[in-house]
């Protein structure tokens, strides 16, 4: 274990999702069993006492890969020279609040964090936005960072892996086969109830999923609706939002981004280059293949009428979200 430690910053570090995330990062689940890490925990001043408790627990685990823990409420210290930033914290949705209200509340938070990242982070920093609404939050952070012309737009991503994992699980449950055999799944769009789980190209143990599940209504209705509504179902069942599964998905997405997928498909929310008719500049869920800490959108997939409609619904929703945000941040979108 002679590698230099990777500096990883986690925001909202005193929160519940971060609590499910930090110990797995420190144990090597995200970057590998031979990669040391330096953890930087960032949260607001009122959370510092709770964050110190998290620090003590991390220390008490005696993780061999964890070389240093820094806990701070100073964003410049938190993001200086960081190589990976996991933006977990976001202003939660109040009871009865609409999604668009949450957008407005979070726009300035992610603009501020993006600006600090753009000025102070490692130029090769990979930024994964976990806090919802993550697509538009990622777009805002990306635009703020671009003002400093140091970190490429493609280094910002939104957490679409949770939707991907949910769809993988449903396909495994439906077919009675191990989830590890599910390949070539595509998930498109926004991390919201419009997200589109697309199994037209998917295989399980090499067998075509559309051939195994010969029921178009299941693909177009049951699978899509189950993935779309999964967060609501978890909230109704446990009285809390999905936390452990969100943290696990963040681990999965960053691990694949950092270490590569060896030719396999996964899903990331990335800035569109115009592929599949998605307007350039939107942060949108696409099927991707990752390698060498970079990604490419899977090219040349057929888009039938149903898929076109589902992709377009997501384009409209994300465009509408940005229209809410733009007047609040004219310095970024003017």
Swiss-Prot record:
Catalytic activity: (S)-malate + NAD(+) = oxaloacetate + NADH + H(+)
InterPro entries referenced in this protein's UniProt entry, alphabetically: L-lactate/malate_DH, Lactate/malate_DH_C, Lactate/malate_DH_N, Lactate_DH/Glyco_Ohase_4_C, Malate_DH_type2, NAD(P)-bd_dom_sf
Entry's EC annotation: 1.1.1.37
UniProt GO BP: malate metabolic process; tricarboxylic acid cycle
Keyword Chloroplast: no
Binding site for NAD(+): 12-18, 106, 113, 130-132
Protein name as annotated: Malate dehydrogenase 2
Organism expressing this protein natively: Albidiferax ferrireducens (strain ATCC BAA-621 / DSM 15236 / T118) (Rhodoferax ferrireducens)
């Amino acid at each position: 274990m002679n590698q230099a430690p990777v500096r990883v910053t986690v925001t909202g570090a005193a929160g519940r999702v971060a609590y499910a995330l930090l110990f797995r990062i420190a144990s090597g689940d995200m970057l590998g069993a031979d990669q040391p890490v330096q953890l930087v925990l960032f949260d607001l001043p009122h959370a510092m006492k709770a964050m110190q408790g998290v620090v003590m627990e991390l220390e008490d685990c005696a993780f061999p890969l964890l070389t240093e823990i820094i806990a701070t409420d100073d964003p410049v210290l938190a993001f200086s020279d960081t190589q990976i930033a996991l933006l977990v914290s976001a202003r939660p949705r109040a009871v009865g609040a609409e999604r668009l209200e949450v957008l407005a509340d979070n726009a300035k938070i992610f603009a501020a964090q993006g600006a600090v990242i753009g000025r102070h982070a490692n130029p090769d920093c990979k930024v994964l936005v976990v806090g919802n609404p993550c697509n538009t939050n990622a777009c805002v952070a990306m635009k703020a960072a671009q003002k400093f012309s140091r970190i490429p737009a493609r280094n910002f991503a939104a957490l679409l892996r949770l939707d991907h994992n949910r769809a993988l699980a449903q396909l495994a449950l439906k077919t009675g086969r191990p989830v590890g055999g599910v390949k070539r799944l595509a998930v498109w769009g926004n991390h919201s109830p419009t997200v589109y789980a697309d199994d037209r190209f998917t295989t399980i143990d090499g067998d075509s999923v559309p051939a195994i599940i010969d029921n178009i209504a299941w693909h177009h209705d049951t699978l899509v609706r189950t993935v779309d509504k999964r967060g609501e179902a978890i909230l109704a069942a446990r009285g809390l939002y999905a936390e452990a599964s969100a943290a696990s998905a963040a681990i999965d997405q960053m691990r694949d981004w950092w270490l590569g997928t060896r030719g396999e498909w996964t899903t990331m929310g990335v800035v569109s280059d115009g592929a599949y008719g998605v307007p350039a500049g939107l942060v949108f869920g696409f099927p991707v293949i990752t390698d060498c800490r970079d990604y490419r959108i899977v090219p040349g997939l057929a888009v039938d009428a149903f898929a076109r409609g589902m992709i377009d619904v997501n384009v409209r929703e994300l465009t509408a979200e940005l229209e809410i945000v733009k007047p609040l941040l004219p310095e970024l979108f003017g």
